[in-house]
A protein has these predicted regions:
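Bacterial N-terminal signal peptides
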Residues: 8-16
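Positively charged n-region of N-terminal signal peptides that target proteins for export
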Residues: 1-4
Length: 330
């Protein structure tokens, strides 16, 4: 396949965004596309995640960009910041620009449906990465994501290990509008329920609250739960930002010595928190592989090649043992 990368780099404008608390993240946003230049490439791959303030989605975007450029495509990246209407408007703009393909992480697995249908009608293929679109009447050409149910099972096993034989009371910080996060909680509960059938020390989920996948809401929901449940023993958060927000609330309440936190993602700051003893463990995802593989599906689609409609990448459990050997960490 002839490469056109040497002819034209993708035109990128970047916005630096912070995610709640003291976390800082870098991410490309509102990537410009020059019509004249686009004609010299194979086309435009457009990416709209849930947010770019979460480094996880930024890493996916970085690898989408790299793989797209490698294969001769321009890249257009925008940031809806968890706003479903904004994301729908962005998809409408992609349609107006007649992009080659849309890569989507739905802000809401159902509400984004009409915008996806509009792209379908315009003949623009839509692919999802990380989280699926569950709306009726939409056509998604391919999906690449973590095996989130399996990752949730790993989180459940880590929780059993963290609490030991005595069991304990658990808060779940969820994000129900994201299908991937629903699967994580389902996998977690499956393992916990199976454990409770056999174990003398039960693990009881006493509260499920929206953590919104960010530090701010993770902190607020945890603070509320700590007031309502003075005997709380542990927290399972569906991603690292909400887990780190939970830790801040736990520390403010001076209960960090007792309460164990299980996160999810394996972002750099999450891994560092595991090494520092703030988070017990993370099932980690591989956003680099997601970004690369979703573009490979787009390339195959454009070439008329066959491919599996769904690719699930297994999560792996990351504990302090791994963190202590991780050269990326301090």
């Amino acid at each position: 396949m002839k490469k056109t990368l040497t002819l034209l780099p993708a035109i990128l404008l970047t916005t630096w965004l912070g995610c709640g608390g003291n976390q800082e993240a870098t991410a490309p946003a509102n990537t410009g596309v020059n019509g004249e230049n686009a004609e010299k490439t194979k086309g435009i791959i457009a990416y709209t995640p849930q947010t770019l303030s979460n480094p996880f989605f930024s890493v996916i975007g970085d690898h989408i960009r790299a793989e797209a450029e490698k294969n001769g495509y321009e890249i257009l990246i925008v940031d809806p910041d968890y706003d479903v209407k904004k994301q729908s408007d962005q998809i409408d703009d992609f349609i107006a620009k007649n992009v080659t393909a849309i890569v989507l992480v739905p802000c809401d697995r159902l509400s984004v449906g009409p915008a996806v249908q509009a792209a379908n009608k315009a003949g623009i293929p839509v692919f999802t990465v990380d989280a699926k679109c569950a709306a009726d009447g939409v056509k998604i050409e391919g999906h690449v994501g973590t095996d989130n149910f399996q990752g949730g099972e790993l989180a459940g096993k880590a929780m059993i290990d963290a609490l030991g034989e005595k069991g304990g009371k658990v808060l779940i910080l969820d994000l129900k509008r994201a299908h991937s996060c629903v699967l994580r909680v389902d996998g977690f509960k499956k393992v916990i329920n199976a454990h409770n059938k056999e174990a003398e020390g039960k693990i009881e989920v006493v509260s499920e609250l929206d953590g919104n996948g960010d530090r701010t809401k993770g902190y607020q929901s945890t603070a509320d739960a700590l007031q309502a449940h003075e005997d709380l023993d542990a927290i399972f958060a569906i991603n690292d930002p909400s887990a780190l927000g939970a830790y801040t609330a736990v520390k403010e309440a001076k209960r960090e010595a007792k309460i164990k936190i299980i996160g999810f993602d394996g972002q750099l700051d999450g891994k560092q928190a595991i090494k520092d003893g703030k988070i017990y463990a993370d099932p980690i995802q591989h956003p680099d592989k997601m970004g690369k593989q979703i573009v490979q599906l787009v390339v195959k689609y454009q070439a008329g090649e066959s491919f599996e409609p769904e690719t699930l990448i297994p999560a792996t459990l990351y504990t302090k043992a791994e963190a202590d050997q991780d050269p990326e960490l301090k």
